[in-house]
Amino acid sequence: MTQEYSTLRNNISMLGRFLGETINDAQGEDILELIENIRKLSRNSRAGDDKARQALLDTLGSISNENIIPVARAFSQFLNLTNIAEQYQTISREHSLAQSSSQSLSELFKRLKEQNASVEEVHKTVEKLLIELVLTAHPTETTRRSLIHKHIEINKCLSKLEHHDLTEKERNIIERLLLRLIAEAWHTNEIRTVRPTPFDEAKWGFAMLENSLWQAVPEFLRQLNETTREFLGYDLPVGLKPVRISSWMGGDRDGNPFVTAQITKKVLYFARWKAADLFLQDISKLADELSMMKCSDEFRDKYGEHLEPYRFVVKNLRNQLTATLAYFDDHLSNRTPRVSESEIILEDNQLWEPLYDCYQSLIQCGMRIIANGSLLDILHRISCFGVTLSQMDIRQESTRHTDAIAEITRYIGLGDYSQWMEDDKQAFLIRELSSRRPLIPQNWTPSPETKEILDTCKVIAQQKQGVIACYVISMARSASDVLAVHLLLKESGVPYHIPVVPLFETLEDLDAAEKVMTQLFNVGWYRGVINNRQMVMIGYSDSAKDAGMMAASWAQYRAQEALVNLTEKLGIELTLFHGRGGTIGRGGAPAHAALLSQPPRSLKNGLRVTEQGEMIRFKLGLPAVAVETFDLYASAILEANLLPPPEPKPEWRTIMDELSTISCDIYRGVVRGDKDFVPYFRSATPEQELSKLPLGSRPAKRNPNGGVESLRAIPWIFAWMQNRLMLPAWLGAGAAIRQIIEQGKGDIIHKMCENWPFFSTRIGMLEMVFSKSDTWLSQQYDQRLVKKELWYLGENLRKQLEDDIQTVLSLSHQSKLMSDLPWIADSIALRNIYTDPLNLLQVELLHRFRENPEQVNPDVEQALMITITGIAAGMRNTG
């Protein structure tokens, strides 16, 4: 065991000991003894002791309603503490000393140097680097903000304890604080009592920006600059914008009726208020620092003669930011603003220009070290966040726009637009887009649904250019879907061009993406307004839910490849926007591997990717973790562009086509083809009970009366993750590979594993999923919750899972899963001891819950919700 791993185990053990002390004080010795007995039985059960396994089942099956909540909370909270310790370990000093990641920027630059890469080419590629993270409020964050704050403080304590020169008194003070924080977490309700509103979700996102990214972005840019200076011998331009932050919070109305035009407006005001607040804090500190008297002649000519010239400029900005804060505070409180727009800061350049002038003057006067202090950090924050804190995406489903235009055409006597052929729709839209007269009559009263669409477009029209990053159309299927949004924006008075982004998300839509975009690019009006720039979003969640992981990932690859080739041919700059989740079933994979498995040239214009729910906290929740995440993203993007992955060989493509067809048929044969599947799914997972957990503002279903097809991808995956069958992430994939091997093509499959990052990443993702799955636990759900006549389905699926595990092991030439990543294998093994009791308790609670759903004991309902959040913590994934 390495010293680093030993420290991690010691930290987990210490946190567990403090949790035990807290439970003893709060609940008494008897409860602590019960919890400890369950833990030991679980550990022995995992070690293969059948008697312990039966005793574990008996103990959890007979647990009283009075004891279920403290038992569920104990195991759930321990898993949260394990996550904290593991997250800290990745940024600890010990970790930094122990290993220099082969995926880091500095290691990439070393490789580039060894391979005699062109310095000019590297220079050019670094200056084009773009990482745009789009924070979304998808309901996958099961941990309350109140607890997240305490978890951050626990992390800070672990950091302090890492110093080996602490006195005994200092160590005792830190450990007492740790014990207090764990006690505070224990006495805090981990389940939200009310579902968050879209505005609450936006505030959560902005808190993440304030507490982590505000510090992380300038730190990463310093690190990036030091690396380029060391390896390339030059400093990056101060105005470079390699990191951008956008958000769907307050803008994503797809399937969420609670995100209205008014909410969007309120979130935009709040974002500006928060940005003014953060910049005001920075500027106030800067005013204390910039006491220097000497400035350049140009600076003096521009700002006048002052004893302390920099302070004069900075104090003016402080006054403007104070007025800006008051202005947006009045708007948020529905008061008439006390100050006018002319007195406040509304555009980035109003902050950037005077501060950049200060920066240049300090450099010219020999004060580079001062210029490169907190002033440079503020300039970097202006470049990344701007005075709006983040850009906002608007997202809406395509049929909502079709319905709105159809309502207009019916009113003005042109018939029903929604029933027209695609060619007729396009002709009408192009005619109206080219026309100077308005389409919508002044005295017309639209339906509430259409009014909401138009009101949203009017909110966009009220914003300055750049505040809204783009308008995303989910379930985009045709060129008219894109043109329709352009028309609605025009009719609502938007005076500038906004990127309208089609989101292709089902298997059929991904396959048709090239054809749809070709039609669009053939429209003269459209080519005229896009300025040879196009963004296209690739949907990972719904395509995997529609066709299974293997078929979906190949369709995503082919769609990206086709779009890259098409836009290169036409001289259009393409940005691919990746709608990934944290789980394998929603396109999740380790960032570096995921990016290097994309088609060649697909990252040449940078990366735009969603960061969702709990993954925001895991990857960006602490400044040091966020810096590491940016470093990994930057390294992968630069590597993909400078050392691109190989083009797949023709025989690899043929194999992937076959794998895709076979796996899709197997997946759909189960999910769509078996009439018993839906009742089995609803019985064997907590899918129905999940809707009671107030995770996010968005309903779990697009259509409340629909079946699996109407269920959103997130609860679909969340439900299967809970019962440890993990079905969406593997069904069809392993069986398809086995069929291909049995056809005598095993050699080609092995070569694909060894030489093609796209395929090897898929196999690695399968291995990770299999490591977290558990057929015995899945069987417990079936036997306790599912009608006997449906048991065959679970038995077939578990047999399929076991066969697939053997297939993947045969490819890796290993006897055990995750043999090449023992640290992860050990982490999963440790978590299983605490997750198993939560799974078995969940089975018992679901049984009690469903026995008499009209009169559920409140303790049973509360404990059930705790098991759901606890298992999510144990799996490190929700949706």
UniProtKB/Swiss-Prot annotation:
Q: Which GO terms describe its biological process?
A: carbon fixation; oxaloacetate metabolic process; tricarboxylic acid cycle
| Annotated GO MF terms | magnesium ion binding; phosphoenolpyruvate carboxylase activity
User: Which key words tag this protein in UniProt?
Assistant: Carbon dioxide fixation, Lyase, Magnesium
Q: Which cofactor does it need?
A: Mg(2+)
Catalytic activity, per the record?
Answer: oxaloacetate + phosphate = phosphoenolpyruvate + hydrogencarbonate
Active-site residue numbers: H138, K545
So which domain of life are we looking at? Bacteria
Q: Which Pfam families match?
A: PEPcase
What Gene Ontology cellular-component terms does the record carry? Answer: cytosol
Q: Kindly give the PROSITE patterns that the UniProt entry links to this protein.
A: PEPCASE_1 (PS00781), PEPCASE_2 (PS00393)
Task: State its Enzyme Commission number(s).
Answer: 4.1.1.31
Keyword flag tRNA processing:
no
HAMAP family reported in the protein's UniProt record: PEPcase_type1
**NCBIfam families in the cross-refs:** PRK00009.1
Record's function text: Forms oxaloacetate, a four-carbon dicarboxylic acid source for the tricarboxylic acid cycle.
Report the family membership: Belongs to the PEPCase type 1 family.
Protein name (Swiss-Prot/TrEMBL): Phosphoenolpyruvate carboxylase
Which organism is the protein's source? Haemophilus influenzae (strain PittGG)
